[in-house]
């Protein structure tokens, strides 16, 4: 190591040779110096007056700190930046060296360089770098290379082994040249790979044991290719345990078994299309009747034809009524009727919704006994055609519902066994025997005249409980305590016309003159002028008889006023004319323009 030559007396100063590298990498020098063979190369820190140069050092003899090195020729090297990994691999070093030489030299840099150097010290081609990496770090393959996990398409013979063989260890030993150190590193790698392979196989066996519950399918799979290839193949199929819909329907149609048929139907997912059954009791579909029918013979299982997505058959043409309600409409009806102590009729499905979230079909309002299970989902059309006798016999149970296409729009209100017709009633009360049966012709808008349409009283589709008193938010009628219906104001068109005639439209109307500006006129304030006449001021006159103006007071903004003959009439104070403060620079000019326009 050469030191800078200094004079004996030290009268002259000198610079130490220093190189700053901003991008650096390790090299092996062609000539050793005192057993040192590793050096540093890199791009020199750029200077404005000088081009960028590549520096190659002699063997490093000492690392003063992490960033400062001393070469054998006495040059000090300062490192700035990180290690260039690509060039380090190109010079024959192992990729593991980048863990230690990240941004400088560690304290044990000589030992790390000797253990991580593999050969080709004077640089190799860049294309040989991937092969060097593969030899240094062999890849670890997963036990199952294919993503689809198919045992037939993925034979075990076509896979690569993940362990290191003895030939690989021999190659590493031949290339290393360091003897015992290379053998130790190769053994560590092979041991590490074997441990990983054992852990992966144990995980596969554990998953197979967890999924094995005594079934023969998994046992045969374990004997086969699952244990050999290490892939987990478990196929779970649940389609074999589905019940046939025909069997479920037969359970529902079995009316002789009574409540057992309902329990079986309930267990086989037919909860959507069944009526309420509690202790072999079926609630009557009539509104407000509250009568229960017992016995298996009287059980009527009400199902919906449209709930299963099927269209109505020819039963509708024969006069048979079948409930037409989709599952979505039933759910909406249940949500609307969730309030306590209220009942309502759905607009879409026509079902009566109770407070306990049960759906009851309002097909037979006469309150007759429910037929046997053989005649379920059907109502005789002859009973619907004679509602008067049925209402007379069972007037306490409810109303007769003549269900048609448009009856929902004009629903009758039943209060204390009396019916009020929304079309022809107008407050007229009819007894139970004289109930007027509404048909689709009377209910539709086509048969109604224009006067009846305009004068008809609107009735809400959502009913309120007849026992509840007070006003309904949706209804336009008021239910009082004596069950009388109070009609709202202005039912007829004639009353509205009279109200329009009585209004004084002349007071509301105003004439519009398009020639006048829309802006509101400001009231002109009658200002008190302090103008003084010439006589009162006692102005002097000239020889020609003209009045001479005395000196004006500028701070008061006095303005002389002349007539057409240029005679002085008076002197005004400008402060009163300009009493309002100016709103801008152009305020005076705007006033002058307005005066000219007028």
UniProtKB/Swiss-Prot annotation:
Residues 19-111 form the SANTA domain. Residues 335-403, 445-500, 520-542, 572-598 are annotated as: Disordered. Residues 538-572 are annotated as: Required for localization at centromeres. One of its GO terms (molecular function) is RNA binding. InterPro entries: Centromere_KNL-2_homolog (IPR053090), SANTA (IPR015216). Coiled coil: none annotated. One of its GO terms (cellular component) is nucleolus. Residues 335-344, 371-381 have a biased composition (Basic and acidic residues). Keywords: Cell cycle, Cell division, Centromere, Chromosome, DNA-binding, Meiosis, Mitosis, Nucleus, RNA-binding. Disruption phenotype: Reduced growth, abnormal leaf shape, defect in mature pollen grain formation and aborted seeds, due to defects in mitosis and meiosis. Pfam families: SANTA. It comes from the Eukaryota. Residues 383-392, 527-539 have a biased composition (Polar residues). GO terms for biological process: cell division; meiotic cell cycle. Expressed in shoot apical meristem, leaf primordia, basal parts of emerging leaves, inflorescence meristems, young inflorescences, developing flower buds, developing sepals and pistils, styles and young siliques. Changing residue 555 to R: Unable to localize at centromeres. It is found in: Nucleus, Nucleoplasm; Nucleus, Nuclear body; Nucleus, Nucleolus; Chromosome, Centromere. Involved in recognition of centromeres and centromeric localization of the centromere-specific histone CENH3. Required for normal progression of mitosis and meiosis. May play a role in the determination of the epigenetic status of centromeres. Binds DNA and RNA in vitro. Belongs to the KNL2 family. This is Kinetochore-associated protein KNL-2 homolog.
């Amino acid at each position: 190591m050469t030191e800078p030559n200094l004079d004996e007396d030290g009268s002259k100063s000198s610079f130490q040779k220093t190189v700053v590298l901003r991008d650096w990498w390790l090299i092996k020098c062609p000539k050793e110096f005192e057993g040192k063979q590793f050096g540093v190369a890199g791009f020199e820190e750029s200077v404005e007056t000088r081009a960028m140069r590549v520096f190659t050092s002699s063997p490093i003899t000492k690392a003063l700190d992490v960033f400062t090195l001393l070469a054998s020729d006495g040059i000090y090297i300062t490192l700035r930046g990180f290690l260039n990994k690509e060039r380090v691999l190109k010079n024959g070093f192992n990729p593991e060296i980048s863990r230690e030489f990240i941004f400088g030299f560690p304290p044990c840099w000589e030992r790390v360089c000797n253990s991580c150097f593999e050969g080709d010290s004077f640089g190799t081609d860049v294309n040989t770098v991937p092969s060097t990496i593969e030899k240094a770090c062999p890849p670890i393959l997963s036990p199952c290379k294919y993503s689809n996990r198919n045992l037939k398409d993925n034979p075990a013979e076509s896979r690569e082994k993940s362990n290191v063989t003895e030939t690989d260890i021999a190659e590493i030993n031949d290339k290393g040249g360091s003897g015992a150190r290379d053998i130790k590193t190769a053994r560590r790698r092979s041991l590490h790979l074997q441990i990983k392979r054992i852990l992966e196989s144990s995980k596969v066996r554990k998953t197979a044991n967890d999924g094995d519950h005594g079934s023969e399918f998994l046992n045969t799979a374990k004997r086969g290719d699952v244990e050999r290839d290490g892939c987990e193949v478990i196929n779970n199929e649940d389609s074999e345990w589905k019940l046939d819909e025909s069997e479920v329907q037969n359970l529902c149609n079995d009316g002789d078994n009574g409540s057992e048929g309902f329990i079986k139907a309930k267990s086989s997912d037919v909860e959507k299309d069944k009526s309420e059954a509690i202790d072999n009791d079926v609630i009557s579909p009539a509104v407000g009747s509250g009568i229960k029918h017992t016995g298996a013979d009287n059980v009527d299982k009400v199902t919906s034809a449209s709930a299963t997505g099927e269209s109505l058959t020819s039963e509708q043409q024969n006069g048979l009524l079948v409930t037409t309600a989709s599952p979505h409409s039933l759910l909406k009806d249940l949500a609307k009727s969730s309030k306590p102590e209220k009942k309502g009729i759905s607009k879409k499905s026509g079902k009566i919704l109770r407070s306990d979230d049960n759906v009851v079909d309002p097909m037979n309002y006469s309150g007759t006994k429910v037929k046997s299970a053989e005649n379920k989902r059907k109502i005789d059309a002859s009973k619907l055609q004679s509602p008067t006798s049925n209402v007379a016999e069972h007037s306490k149970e409810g109303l007769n519902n003549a269900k048609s296409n448009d009856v929902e729009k004009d629903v009758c209100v039943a209060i204390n066994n009396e019916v009020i017709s929304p079309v022809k009633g107008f407050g007229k009360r009819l007894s139970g025997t004289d109930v007027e049966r509404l048909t689709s012709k009377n209910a539709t808008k086509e048969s109604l005249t224009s006067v009846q349409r305009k004068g008809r009283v609107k009735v809400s589709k959502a009913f309120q409980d007849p026992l509840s008193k007070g006003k309904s938010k949706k209804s336009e009628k008021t239910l009082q305590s004596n069950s009388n219906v109070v009609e709202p104001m202005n039912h007829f068109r004639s009353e509205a016309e009279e109200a329009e005639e009585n209004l004084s439209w002349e007071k509301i109307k105003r004439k519009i003159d398009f020639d006048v500006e829309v802006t509101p006129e400001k009231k002109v304030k009658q200002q008190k002028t302090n103008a003084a006449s010439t006589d009162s001021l006692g102005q002097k006159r000239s020889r020609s008889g003209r009045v001479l103006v005395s000196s004006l007071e500028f701070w008061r903004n006095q303005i002389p006023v002349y007539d057409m003959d240029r005679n002085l009439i008076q002197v005004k104070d400008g402060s009163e004319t300009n009493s309002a403060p100016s709103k801008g620079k152009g305020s005076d000019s705007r006033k002058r323009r307005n005066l000219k326009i007028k």
